[in-house]
Amino acid sequence: MSVDMTAPEWMHAQITAAEYESWSEEQCAGIENVDGMVVVSPGASKRHNRLARILANALDAAGGADWNADTDFDVRLQDVPLTNRRPDVVVYRADSIDISPTRPEHVLLAAEIVSPGSETTDRVVKLDQYAGSGIPIYWRVELTPAGIPVVNVYLLDSASRRYRDSEVFTGLVKATVPFPVEIDLPGPW
């Protein structure tokens, strides 16, 4: 018995926002779109997902009624060429929960947890894309060799559309932005 390993046609051609919006949720799961091209993301580990959920739960509680924090959904950075990213955690305006697609003007914070294979994308590419689209705050979470989470906080300089370093936390987050929040992230993860 042979298995057909031919990739679907849509993996080799640019897609438009309209084409993407016609796809089912199942088709959109586990992918991002960069300059119209589909980028398949490997499934996250349970540790990665747990860390994202802990961050999202704490940010959601700290954000009050005006802000939601959730995981695993598209943020539309641009329509042409289509660029959607799926930050690990997104803090967004609560009154935009039913607006689709979520756009940068709805987002207060995007967070990425760096995993093996995503280092350059999370440290350089997404940092630049999120800043260029105007997302005010970026959190990049990395694990030390001992498995302790380090949270790097970046704030947008709106004039240059570049992030500047703000705060760095190891293990225990006591952030002042986007709002005061304390998150205990003991390791190892």
Residue ranges with predicted function:
Residues 1-189:
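Gly/Pro/Ser/Thr-rich low-complexity, intrinsically disordered segments predominantly at protein N-termini
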